[in-house]
């Protein structure tokens, strides 16, 4: 028989989920193209990438599709509209899933929440945004979750490091911002970071600052150790020579004093010599520690009880530059209920993750088998010709690849 208390909690949970306010939910089912607008950004430069509608090369459900970047060295910009709302007095939950099938070297997997002033056809890298959230990978140095909040027209990066997932499987990223100015970041329904908007972003000036008028007192002693005034230099200390004749040295048998002069033994370092005498150190009884200016209220600080509020959210978008394409987005959610978001994640990612992992492992196994079939001995006869051809194209290929990677890092550094 079910525990009455557990049953009550379960019913309360269902009631809470049923009352969740969903502002936007996109599972990329039929008709998704009517809900999403592809931007004209970068089209004139022929560097705008196209999206594929697919479940990917490996998946847990071939019918669960999303949109995937399909062209290398391209910019991507696409957005969807929802009824304008403010999160004042509400919890804001922003969640989506992303999979880097291409084993991403440098590129983003983040999404943006945009205000009502956004022009979807012009949406691009310079378009102001309210929130930018999601994974970002570039080389060995950058493998983190971005959580960038716009406050007073300035973008503020989170000060804490939140590592992102770097494999080739689907992962769910969730950002929760609450009316009490606290937040949580989850990956695959597991909380990875939590804290306060006040402390983990520099949205406001600090409440306290060092007193600029404070001066260190003249008698403030910062020396932790001092020479021992009772310590005395031993008698004869200064008479100890730095070097002494080598006691093991022997006069050569063929040494002729008349011809070679009087023989003297070479000198060696004196093990008794201790250098210039210094009194030993003792704890300073007057030590007060390192002086610090006292903290005072910052006259420039003004609290904002609505620091968490975004008053006119109306669009969600993806804006990326990718050297290597293959990133797949799915199951985008904007709501006010973290429990509903968790449920959606379990219904989609959670239901399919094991099957997806098995499909990926099978694909990797087949790939290894295909590669092992290639016998290097079969190509020995053509090796010289191939080397000549490779040499001719090597410089051009490498320079093109290097230029593209440098461009990717430049774009990444502008974030």
From Swiss-Prot:
Residues 192-257 are annotated as: 4 X approximate repeats. GO terms for cellular component: endoplasmic reticulum lumen. Sequence repeats lie at residues 192-203, 211-222, 228-239, 246-257, 261-271, 275-285, 289-299. InterPro entries: Calret/calnex, Calret/calnex_CS, Calreticulin, Calreticulin/calnexin_P_dom_sf, ConA-like_dom_sf. Keywords: Calcium, Chaperone, Disulfide bond, Endoplasmic reticulum, Glycoprotein, Lectin, Metal-binding, Repeat, Signal, Zinc. PANTHER family: CALRETICULIN, CALRETICULIN AND CALNEXIN. This is Calreticulin. It comes from Ricinus communis (Castor bean). The lineage of its organism: Eukaryota, Viridiplantae, Streptophyta, Embryophyta, Tracheophyta.
């Amino acid at each position: 028989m079910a525990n009455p208390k557990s049953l009550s909690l379960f019913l309360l949970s269902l009631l809470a989920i049923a009352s969740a306010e969903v502002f936007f939910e996109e599972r990329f089912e039929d008709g998704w193209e009517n809900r999403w607008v592809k931007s004209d950004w970068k089209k004139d430069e022929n560097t705008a990438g196209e999206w594929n509608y697919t479940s990917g090369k490996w998946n847990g459900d071939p019918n669960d599709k999303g949109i995937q970047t399909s062209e290398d060295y391209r910019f991507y910009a696409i957005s969807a509209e929802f009824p304008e709302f403010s999160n004042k007095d509400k919890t804001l939950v922003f969640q989506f899933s992303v999979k880097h099938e291409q084993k991403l070297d440098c590129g983003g997997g983040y999404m943006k929440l945009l205000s009502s002033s956004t022009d979807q056809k012009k949406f691009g890298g310079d378009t102001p945004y309210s929130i930018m959230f999601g994974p970002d990978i570039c080389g060995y140095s950058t493998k983190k979750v971005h959580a960038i909040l716009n406050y007073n027209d300035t973008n503020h990066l989170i000060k804490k490091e939140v590592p992102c997932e770097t494999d080739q499987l689907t992962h769910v990223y969730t950002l929760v911002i609450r009316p009490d100015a606290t937040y949580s970041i989850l990956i695959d329904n597991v909380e990875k970071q939590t804290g306060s908007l006040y402390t983990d972003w520099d949205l406001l000036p600090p409440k306290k600052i060092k007193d600029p008028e404070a001066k260190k007192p003249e008698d403030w002693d910062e020396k932790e150790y001092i020479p021992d005034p009772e310590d005395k230099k031993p008698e004869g200390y200064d008479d100890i020579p730095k070097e002494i004749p080598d006691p093991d040295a022997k006069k050569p048998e063929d040494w002729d004093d008349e011809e070679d002069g009087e023989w003297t033994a070479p000198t060696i370092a004196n093990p008794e010599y201790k250098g210039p005498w210094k009194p030993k150190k003792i704890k300073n009884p007057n030590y007060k520690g390192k002086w610090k200016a006292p903290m005072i209220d910052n006259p420039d600080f003004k609290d904002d009880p609505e620091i968490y509020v975004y008053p006119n959210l109306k669009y969600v978008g993806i804006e990326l530059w990718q050297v290597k394409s293959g990133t797949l987005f799915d199951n985008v959610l904007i709501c006010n209920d973290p429990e509903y978001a968790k449920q959606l994640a379990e219904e989609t990612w959670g239901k399919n993750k094991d099957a997806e992992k098995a499909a990926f492992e099978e694909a990797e196994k087949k790939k290894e088998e295909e590669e092992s079939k290639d016998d290097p001995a079969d190509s020995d006869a053509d090796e010289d010709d191939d080397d000549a051809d490779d040499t001719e194209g090597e410089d051009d290929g490498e320079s093109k690849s290097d230029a593209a990677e440098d461009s990717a890092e430049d774009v990444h550094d502008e974030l």
